[in-house]
Amino acid sequence: MKNKIIILAFLFFVSVNSFSQKFYLGDQLSPKSTQFKLLGISSSTGVHTYKYIGAITDTYFYNRRVGEIIVGFKKGIVVTTIYNLIPEKGDVGVPQSTLDLVQSAIPFPLAYSNGMYGANIDNTSISLIRTTNAITFNKDRIMFMTSVKNSLLRN
C-alpha cells in the first residue's frame, strides 16, 4: 500500500512539473521567479498578477497557439488565468472552432455582447475576446480568461 502511495505521489509530482504551464482556478501554487514575472498587485483585491515565463510545452489551447499566459494568485491560490492565443491567418474575431471547443467544455451557453463571449457559472467567470491591449502585451490575441467572482476576491 505504501508503495502505491509513493508511486502515485511521484507520478503526480512529475505530471505537475512536466505540464506546469496549465493552471486551473483553485490550484495551490507558489510562483517562483524562474517561472513567473510579477506584473502587478491589485490594491482592491490583493491579487498578485504574474506572466508565466517558463517553457510552454502544450503549445495549443482550444485549437490556437498559446502566445502568453497570465496567472493571478491570492494567498497562494490561482484565482485568474488568462491564455493569450495567437490568431491564425484569416481569423475574424474569435474563431468558431475555438468557441465550439470552449462551449463543449462548459454546461451553460456562452453569451455574446460587444465582441465578447462569456459565461458566469457559480462563482467563476469565463470570457473570450479578440483584442489588442495591455493584457495582451499590445499584440493581436484571442484572450481566454477565467476568474473567480470579483466580490469573492475582495474578501
Could you tell me what each predicted segment is?
Residues M1-I5, N155:
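Short, Lys/Arg-enriched, disordered terminal segments
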Residues K4-V14:
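Sec-dependent N-terminal signal peptides
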Residues V16-S20:
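Sec/Tat signal peptide C-region and signal peptidase I cleavage site
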Residues Q21-T49, G54, T80, N84-N155:
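Non-cytosolic coordination micro-motifs
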Residues I56-Y62:
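Acidic (E/D-rich), amphipathic helical modules within compact regulatory domains
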Residues Y62-R65, Y112:
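Short solvent-exposed loop/turn micro-motifs enriched in small/polar/acidic residues
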Residues G67-G72, R130-N133:
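Hydrophobic/aromatic beta-strand elements that line small-molecule binding cavities or substrate pockets
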